[in-house]
């Protein structure tokens, strides 16, 4: 199987929407907006003058089988920027085929090309598969805590 990694394009919107829905189902989401709304939201974030985020897509035999979504954060070490990986997902049928590793390697290249001093991300504490994947690639757990405010708490 030949795998290619490339930046998402406008024509990829339906595939991105389907992949994100599959990922959300993997994490237990059961309530979804209509597909057309999802495509509109994705387009609004990825394909505007100053995108909120960027997506790399993995394709196997011309079929989208994985994605990495990321943004840039500033400041990082020495007033550089960091690349923040928000989501890394590979469809179940294509896991354990080095696709996730290929996406991570491409992220490393993007970070280097854009002057980032590091790549950072989180993994769910209960996602043993993700933790095993990152450990197999030699990544170390950072000594950080992750905080979140959401929903109605944003109004206080």
Model features per residue range: what roles?
Residues 112-122:
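Conserved GNAT acetyl-CoA-binding A-motif
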Residues 90, 96-109, 132, 136:
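Conserved acetyl-CoA-binding loop-helix of GNAT-fold acetyltransferases
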Residues 17, 21-44:
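Conserved GNAT-fold acetyl-CoA-binding loop/helix
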Residues 57, 63-72, 89:
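Conserved beta-strand in the GNAT
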Residues 45-56, 84:
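A short helix-loop-beta-strand connector motif used in the catalytic cores of GNAT acetyltransferases and
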Residues 73-85, 95, 142:
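A conserved beta-turn-beta hairpin within the catalytic core of GNAT-like acetyltransferases
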Residues 101, 113, 125-143, 149:
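Conserved active-site alpha-helix within GNAT-family acetyltransferase domains
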């Amino acid at each position: 199987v030949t795998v290619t990694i490339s930046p998402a394009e406008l024509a990829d919107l339906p595939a991105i929407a389907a992949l994100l829905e599959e990922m959300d189902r993997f994490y237990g989401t059961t309530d979804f907006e209509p597909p057309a709304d999802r495509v509109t939201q994705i387009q609004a974030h990825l394909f505007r003058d100053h995108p909120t985020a960027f997506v790399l897509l993995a394709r196997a035999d011309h079929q989208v089988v994985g994605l990495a979504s990321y943004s840039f954060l500033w400041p990082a070490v020495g007033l550089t920027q960091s690349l923040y990986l928000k989501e890394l997902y590979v469809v179940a049928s294509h896991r354990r085929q080095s696709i996730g590793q290929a996406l991570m390697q491409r992220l490393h290249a993007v970070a280097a090309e854009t002057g980032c001093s590091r790549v950072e991300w989180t993994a769910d504490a209960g996602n043993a598969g993700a933790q095993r994947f990152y450990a197999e690639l030699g990544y170390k757990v950072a000594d950080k805590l992750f905080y979140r405010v959401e929903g109605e708490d944003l109004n206080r």
